[in-house]
From Swiss-Prot:
Described purpose of this protein according to its UniProt entry: Na(+)/H(+) antiporter that extrudes sodium in exchange for external protons.
Predominant subcellular localization, coarse grouping: membrane
Gene behind the chain: nhaB
GO MF term list: sodium:proton antiporter activity
Keywords assigned: Antiport, Cell inner membrane, Cell membrane, Ion transport, Membrane, Sodium, Sodium transport, Transmembrane, Transmembrane helix, Transport
Protein name: Na(+)/H(+) antiporter NhaB
Pfam family, one: NhaB
Organism domain of life: Bacteria
Keyword hit for Aminoacyl-tRNA synthetase: no
Catalyzed reactions per annotation: 2 Na(+)(in) + 3 H(+)(out) = 2 Na(+)(out) + 3 H(+)(in)
Residue spans crossing the bilayer: 23-43, 52-72, 97-117, 144-164, 202-222, 238-258, 303-323, 348-368, 391-411, 447-467, 475-495
Topology within the bilayer: Multi-pass membrane protein
């Protein structure tokens, strides 16, 4: 019997999302106009809370859909205007170009990145050294590339290796269902469980590595570019400005990586089983023998393009998004990717998030029009200049750990810039606040998958169920990093940021514009 029209509409609305989630969104959409009539300020804060809720529930439904519906309604009832949204999008065009072109550009360098991580995994036998290498490699790559892409590459390596061993363990050459362990005998299951623990720890080290490297440069995370543009900094300026906080945090983060592996705590310490290593080594040897000259040339070309990418970013030869576009053109031209559909696949990863970021800017427009953050900023600016840095860092950190850090960083840097332009703070203090905002947005956000897009990407990937990586387990494994990164970052903002920045100025390395 066919279902009713009403039931069909309900099932189509937000698809597979739970009924309670659909109902909650409908209640939000009904309440917002009513509360807006009574108090626009309260309605504005309610919208922000609802939007954060959609981000926190990203596993139930991709936030673009519910967040987009809330944003459309906000414009429709007058919380902001379509013109203001357009202005916000125009002001942040560089960030949208970064997401569209840089992420797509790196997609065409995946073969090189896969080669690097495969060599690391099979060449280094010490688990502590391997974990450190993965963390450092992810940090270095994320300083120049998009963190999502770096994590995507590591996921590809892990899924590939898991599939190779799973086929051997199940005695099936065509093992299509990697989640089906029914054909694996007891001995192999024990080894497989150990292998899962090994892969979980490597994935978490790599994920945290993207946060450690991503905070250091203006292209490491999308919000970094927003903050850099607001402060008028280029690549080198941004790196030096952040270094009083980010360099000590990087060192402590890497030490934490070694410590958790040494102590075998928080789910770390599992080594690669020797039987798995033998299987993977055989497969890698076979792959290397089958690699043609054409394949080798592709790797060499991608390495050269990587050098161009780093050089162009460091010398600021063009806007970041345009450099990404040049990578797409060079990589496709020189590696023989000419089919439109093959090129189009590169954009599937970044465009949903680009659309979501545009929705962010709609909510930012509401925040500006309704002056929602004015009381918080007013409270922070009442404190001494020294205390302002820690307060901005803490407020950013609290919100970033449960919400998307692009959203949080955009809000706070806009408010700080408005305070500077109104004369409430000096330009010098504003530049220090920009560092506190950037580090506060990036470092504590490793606490949950909601804060780090790379973590959320890992949690929703095909790999997560294979290696038994749940939301709770990810939060638990991230806990030592969360504590160390957050506390070291706070101490650096409190004690080293101002004096080291002053010393950089005296040396002539940086200057207040």
């Amino acid at each position: 019997m066919e279902i009713s029209w009403g039931r069909a509409l309900w099932r189509n609305f937000l698809g597979q999302s739970p009924d309670w989630y659909k109902l909650a969104l409908i209640i939000f959409l009904i309440l917002n106009p009513l509360i807006f009539i009574i108090s626009p300020f309260v309605a504005g804060w309610l919208l922000v809370a609802e939007f954060i809720f959609t981000l926190a529930m990203a596993l139930k439904c991709y936030p673009l859909l519910p967040g987009g519906l809330l944003a459309i309604e906000a414009v429709f009832i007058g919380m902001t205007s379509a013109e203001h949204v357009r202005e916000e999008v125009a002001a942040n065009l560089e960030v949208l170009l970064l997401l569209m072109f840089m992420v797509a550009g790196i997609y065409f360098m995946k073969q090189l990145l896969l080669f690097i991580f495969t060599r690391l995994l099979l060449s280094i036998r010490s688990k502590m050294l391997l974990s450190l290498s993965f963390c450092m490699a992810a940090a270095f790559l994320s300083a120049f590339l998009d963190a999502l892409t770096v994590v995507a590459v590591v996921i590809s390596v892990a899924v590939g290796f898991y599939g190779i061993y799973h086929r051997v363990a199940s005695s099936r050459t065509e093992d299509t269902d990697l989640q089906d362990d029914s054909h694996i005998d007891k001995h192999y299951k024990v080894v497989l469980e150990q292998f899962r623990g090994f892969l979980r720890s490597l994935m978490m080290h790599a994920g945290v590595g993207t946060a450690l490297g991503g905070v250091m440069t203006m292209v490491g995370e999308p919000q970094n570019l927003i903050i850099a543009k607001a402060a008028g900094w280029h690549f080198g300026d941004f790196f030096l400005r952040m270094s009083p906080v980010t360099v000590p945090v990087l060192i402590c983060g890497l030490l934490t990586c070694l410590l958790v592996e040494k102590l075998r705590c928080f789910g770390y310490g599992e080594t690669l089983p020797e039987k798995v290593r033998e299987v993977l080594q055989q497969f890698d040897d076979q792959s290397r023998h089958q690699r043609t000259r054409q394949d080798k040339i592709r790797l060499i070309v991608q390495a050269i393009i990587g050098v161009w990418l780093v050089t162009a970013l460091a010398l600021h030869l063009a806007e970041v998004g345009l450099i990404g576009l040049s990578v797409i053109i060079l990589a496709t031209s020189l590696t023989g990717v000419t089919d439109e559909h093959a090129i189009g696949k590169a954009f599937t990863e970044s465009l949903p998030f680009t659309a979501l970021l545009t929705v962010f800017f709609s909510v930012v427009a509401v925040i500006i029009d309704q002056q929602l953050f004015s009381p918080i900023i007013h409270f922070v600016l009442q404190a001494s200049e020294h205390a302002q840095l820690s307060l901005f860092y803490i407020f950013n950190g609290l919100l970033s750990s449960i919400s998307d850090n692009v959203f949080v960083g955009t809000i706070y840097i806009n408010e700080a810039k408005a305070a500077m332009e109104s004369g409430a703070i000096t330009l010098k203090q504003y530049e220090l606040l920009a560092v506190a905002i950037n580090t506060g947005t990036n470092l504590p956000s490793v606490a949950t998958p909601n804060g780090q897009a790379a973590f959320l990407f890992l949690l929703t990937s095909a790999l997560a169920p294979l290696i038994r990586l749940s939301y709770g387990r990810m939060v638990w494994m991230a806990l030592p990093y969360t504590l160390v990164l957050t506390l070291v970052g706070l101490l650096c903002v409190e004690f080293t940021l101002a004096p080291v920045t002053e010393w950089f100025m005296q040396m002539g390395w940086i200057a207040t514009l």
